């Protein structure tokens, strides 16, 4: 899909196709054991899966207070919310014609659910009240290609654009609200590989403990550390296993990084991050798998478990298909 003409209807198939091509070009898979979810007895109060509305076509997931979750739709731009312990969902943000949501991130300071996506050919970043569903900010990103994921830091919202080699930044005020300024951009330089047309580059994004950013690359593979001030990007060396491929969403819990690889194998790669000689190093810890995973796109951590939303990209009947969240044991 050309970056200048994003299509809601073709989004899922195009996304799957781009990542699958990357996986086919790289035959290496993560070394280390694949951990099936065999420890569910430790969380008897939590379900193995959480049902989502049929036809939702989910992609982004984030978690709020307690066991509250939020999931966005790539097909109609709605956000649904519910409890990971079960009990159904409700619509937080109503659908809108032409709107497509991708990454979501809940900011506990403000109770806002931030979302990236598009309305037709326009790229947007939204802030939605996590209780009422009111849209408190709608930031137009001029020149955007394919906004994909985001992270909220102390003074900014950073977001990836999978078709452009840059990160976007929305300034926040001291209260964690949008400061009302136009987005700024930082070009990805250094070791970052150029993103070819009709492929996906930067995808998942999280903030490291030193204030730098970690991103993955859906086509070229690897984990990458970005200096947010200069854009200089260095690949994070992976030990005890080959570099990851086909990454989508990222989750960082302490020093453990989870790389969701839906189209690359329907699993979650696990890494232990540490600084060594002034650079970040990732030690492969294996993979999380489960029979109920079906092209997971993103995940969130809540109630001691990792929760992966199954986007099911490539399903022949996406507008009527069943969708669900899979619980995975953290390790």
Residue ranges and their predicted role:
Residues 127, 322-330:
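Beta-propeller blade signature
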Residues 130-185:
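Hydrophobic alpha-helical segments and helix pairs
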Residues 70-76, 107, 113-121, 158-163, ...:
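Conserved beta-strand positions in repeat-built beta-propeller and related beta-rich domains
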Residues 40-55:
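A short helix->beta-strand "capping" segment at the edge of beta-propeller domains
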Residues 1-13, 21-29, 38:
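N-terminal secretory signal peptides
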Residues 53-69, 96-117, 141-158, 191-212, ...:
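Beta-rich, blade/repeat-based domains predominating
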Residues 83-87, 129-133, 173-175, 227-231, ...:
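Short loop/turn segments that connect beta-strands within beta-propeller blades
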């Amino acid at each position: 899909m050309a970056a200048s003409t994003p299509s809601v209807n073709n989004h899922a198939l195009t996304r799957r196709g781009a990542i699958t091509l990357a996986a086919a070009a790289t035959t290496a898979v993560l070394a280390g054991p694949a951990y099936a979810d065999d420890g569910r007895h430790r969380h008897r109060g939590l379900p193995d899966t959480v049902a989502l509305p049929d036809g939702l076509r989910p992609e982004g997931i984030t978690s709020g207070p307690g066991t509250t979750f939020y999931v966005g739709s790539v097909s109609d731009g709605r956000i649904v919310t519910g409890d990971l312990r079960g009990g159904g969902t409700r619509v937080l943000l109503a659908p809108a014609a032409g709107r497509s949501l991708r990454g979501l991130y809940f900011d506990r300071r403000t109770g806002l659910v931030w979302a990236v996506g598009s309305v037709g050919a326009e790229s947007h970043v939204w802030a939605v009240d996590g209780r009422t569903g009111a849209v408190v900010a709608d930031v137009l990103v001029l020149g955007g290609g394919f906004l994909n994921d985001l992270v909220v830091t102390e003074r900014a919202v950073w977001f990836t654009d999978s078709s452009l080699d840059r990160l976007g930044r929305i300034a926040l005020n001291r209260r964690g609200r949008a400061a009302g300024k136009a987005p700024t951009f930082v070009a990805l330089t250094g070791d970052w590989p150029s993103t070819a047309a009709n492929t996906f580059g930067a995808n998942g994004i999280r903030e490291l403990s030193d204030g730098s950013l970690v991103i993955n690359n859906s086509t070229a593979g690897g984990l990458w550390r970005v200096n947010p001030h200069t854009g200089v990007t260095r690949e994070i060396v992976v030990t005890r296993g080959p570099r990851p491929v086909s990454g989508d969403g990222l989750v960082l819990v302490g020093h453990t990084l989870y790389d969701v690889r839906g189209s690359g194998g329907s699993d979650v790669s696990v890494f232990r991050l540490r600084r060594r000689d002034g650079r970040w190093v990732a030690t492969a810890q294996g993979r999380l798998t489960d029979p109920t995973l079906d092209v997971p796109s993103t995940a969130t951590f809540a109630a001691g478990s990792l929760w992966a939303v199954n986007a099911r990209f490539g399903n022949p009947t996406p507008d009527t298909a069943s969708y669900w969240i899979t619980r995975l044991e953290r390790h």
